[in-house]
């Protein structure tokens, strides 16, 4: 890949949960409205939470998570809200790419993981291979009902606005973010920005701030050696985060999940072959018992 690698840095410490990024993603990609029954929210948005989408899906490529850390009595002077704008991480070592049997998932020149929906056969191996639960199967919408990205029977996810990036534009979500919590740019520049943000927060006493996706010190960037330390996963994330609590609080793996087996088809074939052998053996044993029983009756 000769082109400059692009990505996004998501600084959760300045996310206000406004959801402008969610709206911008929906509008630019012409995604259909999320089915509230499908995300099992019911009236939760009106009652206990500001989270109105629940999770990422085939029609919801960006989701603002709300982590409400308050005691049971909801004392205003205690606790905090943590918020994170979540999407595909466009992993350097992408499990979805490893297991896709058709090449429907592919790497762009800028480092994003994109999808050829006309090549996708809907096998859903990538869904299980993604350690972040990003990829979803679309079994409801086609392009007439759900917009140009919707091909019924295929998978969908954030594609890092590959059409915009190819034309020299940033991502729609980053452009819409009013606080610069989401920043699009060259990957090295974003790492430098992330290191400066971690340094600034630690200087102010917020030593729980760290980067999820890269080890900035190992990458040669200056950041504090004390306090919370960065975590590099799956070879690095082209969309990476500044977090203020443990990864699992944000619904992320606490450890590097690594790559899935590169080709799961031989294993699947072996399982089918074994099932066939056992089936034939079972039929043969059943027939033998019937013949023995018939002989005894005579």
Language-model features: where?
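Non-ligating segments of multi-cofactor redox enzymes
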Residues: 1-298
């Amino acid at each position: 890949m000769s082109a400059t690698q692009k990505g996004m840095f998501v600084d959760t410490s300045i996310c206000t949960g406004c959801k402008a990024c969610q709206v911008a993603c929906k509008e630019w990609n012409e995604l259909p409205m999320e089915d509230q029954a499908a995300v099992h929210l019911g009236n939760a948005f009106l009652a206990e939470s500001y989270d109105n989408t629940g999770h990422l899906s085939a029609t919801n490529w960006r989701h603002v998570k709300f982590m409400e850390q308050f005691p049971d009595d909801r004392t205003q002077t205690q606790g905090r809200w943590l918020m994170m704008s979540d999407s595909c991480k466009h992993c350097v070592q992408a499990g979805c790419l490893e297991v896709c049997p058709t090449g429907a998932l592919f790497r762009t020149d800028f480092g994003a993981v994109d999808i050829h929906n006309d090549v996708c056969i809907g096998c859903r191996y990538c869904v299980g291979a993604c350690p972040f639960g990003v990829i979803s199967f679309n079994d409801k919408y086609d392009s007439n009902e759900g917009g140009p990205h919707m091909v019924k029977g295929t998978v969908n996810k954030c594609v890092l606005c590959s059409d915009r990036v190819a034309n020299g534009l940033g991502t729609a979500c980053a452009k819409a973010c009013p606080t610069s919590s989401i920043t699009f740019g060259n990957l090295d520049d974003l790492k430098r920005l992330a290191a400066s943000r971690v340094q600034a927060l630690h200087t102010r006493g917020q030593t729980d701030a760290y980067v999820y996706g890269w080890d900035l010190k190992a990458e040669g960037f200056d950041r504090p050696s004390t306090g919370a330390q960065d975590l590099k996963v799956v070879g690095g994330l082209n969309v990476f985060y500044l977090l203020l609590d443990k990864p699992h609080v944000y619904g992320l793996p606490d450890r590097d999940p690594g790559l899935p087996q590169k080709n799961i088809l031989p294993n699947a074939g072996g399982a089918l072959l074994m099932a066939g052998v056992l089936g034939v053996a079972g039929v043969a044993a059943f027939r033998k018992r019937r013949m023995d029983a018939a002989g005894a009756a005579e």
